[in-house]
């Protein structure tokens, strides 16, 4: 899979951009705040219909304009695809795939698969469970429509349940709460089961990758942390947990248990890297997660996704840089950097270089 062509109109600092890419390595060089990351952001947006940097689509629209436009041509093993997205200031978006309008975001998922690696990804390791749940949700939605549907339905029911909990003192809603709990347990089972399976696969792929990066010194493992004691009867057990904690939920006015509160831990040699790992170990863990994600997607769809490396080489030591640059020969890769000193000459010789300056891109 690779992106052949990208067109932007009024996207971030680009008034208009038409650009063709090499199917292997593409490097964007330029000072900070010139628009390098914006190009990668537009590709990511075409993958899942959301930005990795903001939850407000209107921020993607160039100043004083009412809409922006993204178009990508994707070449895959079995077919070619063209994605067009219009983003409107009032918060709506229009998506066409091969000139056919699609009404559901789920129809966009999987058309263009990307894995993005940026310095911000350290938050997955270092900060709250929100970032780790978001990582799981995004990765699973890329290839599992079952997960996407289950997640959407679960969140709808969760929102409705929390509304009932907040206004409990104004009436007795026990019957409707019973219905909501059954629905949460049903959709929660889908989420928990697929998350647990994904983390097992991430551990399997990650062990090999992490061992390569650390010369066999470190062993990595990803472990799902949930309110359940086992995964044998997820739906029944989750319903019982919701039922048992109902009074507590009513008192707090919020649902305290379920996959929306789950987490996962990253262990290196049996030690939680979030609490006790060095900065280097935390960075290596993220690198492992990203490259394990690449391998999982390849295993499922039969080809590598597109890899987006946003200003990460300068953040890594020589060994980690070496691992990345030796692992991308079969993967279309987009690299942003302020200079090419951190990139091997052999890579540069094979890559397509672009200079980015004030929203203008020129091919070298």
From Swiss-Prot:
Family annotation (InterPro entries): DNA-binding_RecF, DNA-binding_RecF_CS, P-loop_NTPase, RecF/RecN/SMC_N, RecF_2
Keyword DNA repair: yes
Location in the cell: Cytoplasm
Domain of life per record: Bacteria
Residues annotated for ATP binding in this entry: 30-37
GO cellular component: cytoplasm
Gene3D superfamilies per UniProt: P-loop containing nucleotide triphosphate hydrolases (3.40.50.300), RecF/RecN/SMC, N-terminal domain (1.20.1050.90)
GO molecular function annotation: ATP binding; single-stranded DNA binding
TM stretches of this protein: none
Single Gene Ontology BP annotation: DNA replication
Keyword line: ATP-binding, Cytoplasm, DNA damage, DNA repair, DNA replication, DNA-binding, Nucleotide-binding, SOS response
Known function: The RecF protein is involved in DNA metabolism; it is required for DNA replication and normal SOS inducibility. RecF binds preferentially to single-stranded, linear DNA. It also seems to bind ATP.
Family of the protein in this entry: Belongs to the RecF family.
PANTHER family, per database record: DNA REPLICATION AND REPAIR PROTEIN RECF
Protein name: DNA replication and repair protein RecF
């Amino acid at each position: 899979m690779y992106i052949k062509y990208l067109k932007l109109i009024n996207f971030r600092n680009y008034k208009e951009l038409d650009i063709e890419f090499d199917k292997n390595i593409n490097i964007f060089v330029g000072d900070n705040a010139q628009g390098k990351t914006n190009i990668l952001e537009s590709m990511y947006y075409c993958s899942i219909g959301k930005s990795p940097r903001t939850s407000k689509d209107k921020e993607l629209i160039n100043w004083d304009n009412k809409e922006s436009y993204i178009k990508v041509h994707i070449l895959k093993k079995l077919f070619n695809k063209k994605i067009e997205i219009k983003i409107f200031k009032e918060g709506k978006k229009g998506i066409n795939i091969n000139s056919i309008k699609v009404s559901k975001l789920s129809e966009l998922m999987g058309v263009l698969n990307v894995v993005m690696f940026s310095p911000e990804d350290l938050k997955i390791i270092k900060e709250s469970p929100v970032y780790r749940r978001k990582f799981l949700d995004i990765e699973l939605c890329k290839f599992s429509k079952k997960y996407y549907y289950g997640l959407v339905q679960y969140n709808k029911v969760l929102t409705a349940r929390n509304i009932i909990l907040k206004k409990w003192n104004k009436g007795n809603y026990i019957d409707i709460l019973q219905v909501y709990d059954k629905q949460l347990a049903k959709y929660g089972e889908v989420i928990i089961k697929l998350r647990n399976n994904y983390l097992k696969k991430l551990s399997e792929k990650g062990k090999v990758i992490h061992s390569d990066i650390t010369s066999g010194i470190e062993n990595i493992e990803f472990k799902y942390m949930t309110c359940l004691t086992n995964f044998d009867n997820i739906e029944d057990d989750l319903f019982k947990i919701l039922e048992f904690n109902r009074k507590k939920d009513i008192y707090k006015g919020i649902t305290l248990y379920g996959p929306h509160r789950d987490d996962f831990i990253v262990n290196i040699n049996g030690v939680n890297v979030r609490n006790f790992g060095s900065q280097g170990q935390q960075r290596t863990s993220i690198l492992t997660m990203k490259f394990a994600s690449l391998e999982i997607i390849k295993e499922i769809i039969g080809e590598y996704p597109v890899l987006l490396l946003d200003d990460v080489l300068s953040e890594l030591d020589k060994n980690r840089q070496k691992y990345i640059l030796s692992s991308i020969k079969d993967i279309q890769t987009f690299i942003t950097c302020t200079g090419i000193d951190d990139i091997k000459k052999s890579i540069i010789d094979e890559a397509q270089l672009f200079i980015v300056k004030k929203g203008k891109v020129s091919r070298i």
